[in-house]
A protein has these predicted regions:
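Anion-binding alpha/beta catalytic cores of soluble intermediary-metabolism enzymes, centered on
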Residues: 95-155
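Positively charged, low-complexity intrinsically disordered leader regions
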Residues: 1-30
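Short beta-strand segments enriched in small/hydrophobic residues
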Residues: 31-40
Length: 282
């Protein structure tokens, strides 16, 4: 039976450190502020925004919410971002994705000042991750690295397989593992003989978006399996990994919920703190 990698425990440790540093900055007269923009009324996005606000309050970070109508124009949205870029009390800006179809997401991401881009989606920050000289890391991959380190799972020299090549998880995840001297393979929908590749992984990261996609026969004995998937089925949250069978074979596994999910918001808070420190010369 696998050891459960508890993201709630790791997230609590990260948030505790952030809260301490926010207090320390407060004693120096520096506040930390995060602006969250939500366009439209996507229910899942509303839940994420609510959770971010709650976590900000817990850690002493000021939360600024901008709730815009789903019909807002791209130019109006970019104009708001421009205002926030120039507002000293706001250290981080996050525009909740997905955006309505009439708005170009990349144009909006590019409008956010790179030093306030706490999601690390701006092309400048993506480029910095590529060369290993980064200020911010995308929250989910950074959270996964935090989990691996917290539980002492060795990365250097290991075979790591990432299933999924999204800009939000798959690609940056592979770069972070590479920077830690792992041998990394990225798999996707066109990968041939997927099972042959994944069953060689010491660390397997599943970011596919299909419930129960990874089965026991795809996993190496003693592997660490990281499940990024959040799939809803009849009100139940399911990961990309078939937990019951894979947990009998892997040495380590993250559950869904309670694995990677809690880390994403914790790392967002850490990025916001980093932004505040940089903007105030700390």
């Amino acid at each position: 039976m696998s050891k459960i990698l508890d993201g709630k425990v790791v997230a609590a440790a990260v948030k505790s450190k952030v809260a301490d540093e926010v207090k320390k900055l407060g004693r120096e007269g520096i506040s930390v502020g995060l602006a969250v923009i939500l366009v439209g009324d996507n229910p899942a996005s509303q839940i994420y925004v609510k959770n971010k606000k709650k976590t900000c309050e817990e850690l002493g970070i000021k939360s600024y919410e901008y709730l815009l109508d789903g019909n807002v124009s791209e130019q109006e949205l970019i104009s708001l971002i421009d205002t926030l870029n120039n507002e000293p009390s706001i250290n981080g800006i996050l525009c909740q994705l997905p955006l309505p179809g009439h708005i170009n997401e990349q144009a909006v991401i590019s409008a956010i000042s790179p030093n306030k881009d706490v999601d690390a989606f701006h092309t400048q920050n993506v480029g910095k991750i590529m060369i290993g000289n980064f200020d911010f890391l995308p929250c989910t991959p950074a959270g996964i690295m935090e989990i691996l380190d917290y539980y002492g799972i060795e990365i250097e020299g290991k075979n790591c397989v990432v299933i999924g090549r999204s800009n939000i998880v798959g690609k940056p995840m592979s770069m972070l593992l590479l920077h830690r001297n792992a041998t990394v393979t990225i798999c996707h929908s066109k990968t041939r003989n997927l099972k042959d590749v994944t069953s060689n992984a010491d660390i397997l990261v599943a970011a596919v978006g299909k419930a129960g996609f990874v089965t026991a026969d795809m996993v190496k004995d003693g592997a660490a399996v990281i499940d990024v998937g959040i799939n809803r089925d009849n009100g139940k949250l399911l990961g990309d990994v078939s937990f019951d069978e894979v947990s009998q074979k892997a040495a380590y596994i993250t559950p869904v919920p309670g694995g990677v999910g809690p880390m994403t918001i914790a790392m967002l808070m850490k990025n916001t703190l980093t932004a505040a420190k940089q903007q105030n010369g700390r």
